[in-house]
Curated annotation (Swiss-Prot):
Residues 20-401 are extracellular. The tyrosine-phosphorylated isoform 2 interacts with PTPN6. One of its GO terms (cellular component) is cell surface. This is Fc receptor-like protein 2. Residues 423-508 are cytoplasmic. It comes from Homo sapiens (Human). Glycans are attached at N204, N234, N343, N355, N365. One of its GO terms (molecular function) is signaling adaptor activity. Expressed in the secondary lymphoid organs, spleen and lymph node. Expression is limited to the mature B-cell lines. Highly expressed in CD19 and within the mantle zones of the tonsil tissue. Isoform 2 is expressed in the spleen, peripheral blood and bone marrow. Isoform 2 and isoform 4 are expressed in B-cell lines. Preferentially expressed in memory B-cells (at protein level).
Length: 508
């Protein structure tokens, strides 16, 4: 009887065990939620309930409860079942086993690069490659790239590619990428890849001069441009003056060229220059460049030179213009009251002259202008007053001399006439009173009578008009004689008592 009772109880327990069921999805994808539901009779009390995976207890409850896996991963794949324990040991129950397989939503990403040994300064393209499951092509992914735990670019992006415009030697290191769903449930990381950036030595260093107008001018800005034809990375540029050998300046930048500026060039800055460039390899030097500094002309000085103490009509006036500073060639312009007279150049610097034959209209202000292409400078005005014509003064002096001679000759003629009359009267008186036997007078004594046709005409024996350098401008010497007859002309010419008239006019 007892045995029969035990068989009845065992049959009842077995019947209840068959009623404990585990409900779970058999196939899920990464990131999906998994709900395990253990179902059984609720008319009897349980001491505990548990969920198991591969014979390992996952979770224990005091009543029937669901077991939730929020986001499935591949490791969640396995055999699941649930169990209950009643108040009596005969009430222990175990559910059916459900095999769950978690499928991969997308493959583990792989980092690829356009080059894993790029040239410094060149671009690099990174790509995070993966593939979605054909059953879940509608899932959206986002990507992020890293170098040595540093996020590259703008961070997470829907694009699986990253373009780096230029990489440098310091960009050498380990790179990887991550891919995740936009819901952030599944995130996968690629393996790390090593990228080594190659540096290229610099080559062909050159020094170039840049100045306003293409020429270096005192007081203006000068730029010394040092450049390299090739090379990568940070380049250190330095500038030198050959005469001193000391560095004028230094710049380090990631560029193929750099500038050194001289704000205001001085005349002493003229000379030879060169530059050097270095990017960590052997420094390279440029060729030496000679830099001439052109000097603008200073304010010129105008000097006037004339033959006499005062300029006069007919004089040759020399206008000399000179700028004490200024690079040649210098062009000089000469002006009379803002009217251009002419120009003259000084190819080697210094001053220049311009000659002007003066007329009465040349009185006024004179000035000059100097220009060597770097700006014109004008001198101060110099006033000039022109006196009367020199030829006119000479004519007046000549006329005065002639009038003076005529006056002297007239006075002399009157005196000679009175002298002749006086001697004639005296002779007649002597002849009347002279005895008949008286002897004739001495042949050397003169008896003046009226002039006869044979009387020798007055002739000048010396005439001279002095040159400009002699004070005497006109002189005459006259010899006046009244011989009794042509026979004694020689005797009279040899007579020391002959009357001689000298006259001369000197320049006042």
């Amino acid at each position: 009887m007892l045995l029969w009772s035990l068989l009845v109880i065992f049959d009842a327990v077995t019947e209840q065990a068959d009623s404990l069921t585990l409900v779970a999805p058999s196939s899920v994808f990464e990131g999906d939620s998994i709900v395990l539901k253990c179902q059984g009779e609720q008319n009897w009390k349980i001491q505990k309930m548990a969920y198991h995976k591969d014979n390992k207890e996952l979770s224990v409850f005091k009543k029937f409860s669901d077991f939730l896996i929020q986001s499935a991963v591949l490791s969640d794949s396995g055999n699941y079942f649930c169990s209950t324990k009643g108040q009596l040991f005969l009430w222990d129950k175990t559910s059916n086993i459900v095999k769950i397989k978690v499928q991969e939503l997308f493959q583990r990403p792989v980092l690829t690069a356009s080059s894993f040994q790029p040239i410094e300064g060149g671009p690099v393209s990174l790509k995070c490659e993966t593939r979605l499951s054909p059953q879940r092509l509608d899932v959206q992914l986002q990507f992020c790239f890293f170098r040595e735990n540093q996020v590259l670019g703008s961070g997470w992006s829907s694009s699986p590619e990253l373009q780096i415009s230029a990489v440098w030697s310091e960009d050498t290191g380990s790179y990887w990428c991550k891919a995740e769903t936009v819901t952030h449930r599944i995130r996968k990381q690629s393996l790390q890849s090593q990228i080594h950036v190659q540096r290229i030595p610099i080559s062909n260093v050159s020094l170039e001069i840049r100045a306003p107008g293409g020429q270096v001018t005192e007081g203006q800005k000068l730029i010394l441009l040092c450049s390299v034809a090739g090379g990568t990375g940070n380049v250190t540029f330095s500038w030198y003056r050959e005469a001193t050998g000391t560095s004028m300046g230094k710049k380090t930048q990631r560029s193929l060229s750099a500038e050194l500026e001289i704000p205001a060039v001085k005349e002493s800055d003229a000379g030879k220059y060169y530059c050097r460039a270095d990017n960590g390899h052997v420094p390279i030097q440029s060729k030496v460049v000679n830099i001439p500094v052109r000097i603008p002309v200073s304010r010129p000085v105008l000097t006037l030179r004339s033959p006499g103490a005062q300029a006069a009509v007919g004089d040759l006036l020399e206008l000399h213009c000179e700028a004490l500073r200024g690079s040649p060639p210098i062009l000089y312009q000469f002006y009379h009251e803002d009217v251009t007279l002419g120009n003259s150049s000084a190819p080697s610097g210094g001053g220049a002259s311009f000659n002007l034959s003066l007329t009465a209209e040349h009185s006024g202000n004179y000035s000059c202008e100097a220009n060597n292409g770097l700006g014109a400078q004008c001198s101060e005005a110099v006033p000039v007053s022109i006196s009367g014509p020199d030829g006119y003064r000479r004519d007046l002096m000549t006329a005065g001399v002639l009038w003076g001679l005529f006056g002297v000759l007239g006075f002399t003629g009157v005196a000679l006439l009175l002298y002749a009359l006086f001697h004639k009267i005296s002779g007649e008186s002597s002849a009347t009173n002279e005895p008949r036997g008286a002897s004739r007078p001495n042949p050397q004594e003169f008896t003046y009578s009226s002039p006869t046709p044979d009387m020798e005409e007055l002739q000048p024996v010396y005439v001279n008009v002095g040159s400009v350098d002699v004070d005497v401008v006109y002189s005459q010497v006259w010899s006046m004689q009244q011989p009794e007859s042509s026979a004694n002309i020689r005797t009279l010419l040899e007579n020391k008592d002959s009357q001689v008239i000298y006259s001369s006019v000197k320049k006042s």
